[in-house]
Amino acid sequence: LSTDAPPAPAVPNTFEPPTAFAYPPLAWNAARFRFEVRQAPGEGGTKALCKTIENKLFQRGQIFIGRPGSKNYTLEMDVLTEGNKRKMSEIGLINQRYLVVLKGNSQQLEVSSNQERFRESVPFAWVPNQWYRLKARVDVAADGSGSVKAKAWKKGEEEPAVWTIEVAHKHAHTEGAPGLFSFTPQEQRAWIDNISVVPNNTATR
């Protein structure tokens, strides 16, 4: 391919100095250019998945890491948002088509599906630059009704015995790929680490 037109000028990344990174697994749908594997903050040199902020077109990142027919599993992971008390990002997971999100600026833990049609939240106080553990599962009854359960707690502390939020759904989703989510509208990086997907019958609590 050749052209007489001059090449487009390179656009520098003005958000950060040159940073070493690796791409996420290729099989993770739509992960590249939205997420990168980088050295994690405060993790002693370990690597974590970073939601990038230099491209404003990709402020919202939603990726799937498993098969669409997956069901009856518990998904959990470590999460962190950079920022301050007035500027935080959103980080969450997708379990069986339900989006479970820690919302920074509104200080909530939210469960939603199809956004406006199904959405419930509870207050949850959390701070930037601190790792938390986020966990969720979906239980579906024989009559098709279901319950979405999620909890979050500060990493390093004991897991709470009760769920932070539990939402009933009359017609529950019976399957759906596990996934990851982040929204960075105020250019604060979000981080995800130590992802675990296990069958519900082997998950603790």
Language-model segments: which ranges?
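Flexible glycan-contacting loops in extracellular carbohydrate-active proteins
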Residues: 159-191
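Beta-strand-rich interaction surfaces with strong enrichment in secreted/lumenal proteins
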Residues: 61-67, 119-126, 167-169, 180-182
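Secretory/extracellular carbohydrate-interaction modules
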Residues: 41-117, 200-202
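Extracellular glycan-recognition surfaces and repeat-rich motifs
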Residues: 7-11, 16-48
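Short tryptophan-centered beta-strand motifs in secreted/extracellular beta-sheet-rich domains
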Residues: 75-77, 129-142, 146-152
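Short, aromatic/His-centered strand-loop micro-motif at the edge of beta-sheets
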Residues: 112-137
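Extracellular beta-strand elements of beta-rich domains used
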Residues: 1-3, 77, 193-197
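Extended, low-complexity, turn-rich repeat/linker tracts enriched in Gly/Pro/Ser/Thr and Asp/Glu
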Residues: 81-86, 140-144, 186
